[in-house]
Amino acid sequence: MRIDAHHHLWDLDVRDQPWTRTIPVLRHSFTMDDLRPELHRSAVDATVVVQTLPTPEETPELLALAARDPHIRAVVGWTDLTHPAISDHLSELLAHPGGAALAGIRHGVQDEPDPQWLNRPDARRGLAAVGAAGLAYDLLVRPDQLPAAVRTVREMPDVRFVLDHAGNPEIAPDGLERWAALLAGLGHCDNVAVKLSGLVTRAPAPHAPSLRPYADVLLEQFGPERLMFGSDWPVCLRATDYAGTVAVAESLTGALSTDESAQVYGGTAARWYGTDT
């Protein structure tokens, strides 16, 4: 089973996405009716839909959608990680219609000014609650927050972590070595996987040549068994269409064996998010 481990959905008639206001290509609704034909064309069988807004209303809507749409096998939702009652909030989400699809939680740490935000006591308490609920935690961080992410992952071995967008590296001649050094600390932790996602929008066309060294680092440090493909649709449309995003990823992983490729394009996501293969 081929799994897209990272995409988004939104309906601007239901809720605004303020961050899209200056991005014309993203300034309209994107639904499963739009994505479904793209999945078919790229032979993708299942998906993991990921939250976009720090609002309590979005995640129940995604769970309800997962209950109706067989393509959506998992939801990475949002709840206030620092709220004292986070355990109760997670229980409520799991009991919601479609709650069985809740596989992870994400907070946009990249929007927090503090590079040590993950090491705050209230954040750590929330992460522990996520792990205790049997859920993964998606790390959405800036490169300067990677040291805090490394410390957090090391000190919380019972929590499953997923690093979104490879840690948002700067795709530049002087960016590779610095990013690889920061990432190495996570590579040694077996409780974290990483997404090959969100990179086409950071690299100039034709994308693959400038991204290949980064993909090589990911494979070297994490291996196929801890690497998962995600399209980051529709955000990827800023650079290329869905099929183009898949093609870039397949080019970057083309040297893998059939079994290794099956991990990147399904097996890793299925294990980390608990989806059926």
Q: Positions of the model-derived regions?
A:
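An N-terminally biased module of ancient metal coordination in phosphate/nucleic-acid-related enzymes
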Residues: M1-A66, A247
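Mid-to-C-terminal alpha-helical segments outside catalytic/metal-binding sites
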Residues: M1-I3, L26-A46, V217, Q221-M228, ...
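Conserved, mostly hydrophobic/aromatic
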Residues: H6, T47, L62, V75, ...
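Catalytic metal-binding/acid-base residues of hydrolase active sites
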Residues: H8, L53, Q110, G167, ...
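Alpha-helical scaffolding within the catalytic cores
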Residues: F30-L35, E57-E58, A85-S91, L146-P147, ...
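Active-site gating/metal-coordination segments in enzymes
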Residues: E57-D144, R151, A193-V200
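Short, electropositive alpha-helical surface patch
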Residues: E57-R73, P157-L163, Y214-E220, T245-L252
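Catalytic pocket-lining loop regions of alpha/beta-barrel enzymes
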Residues: W117-M228
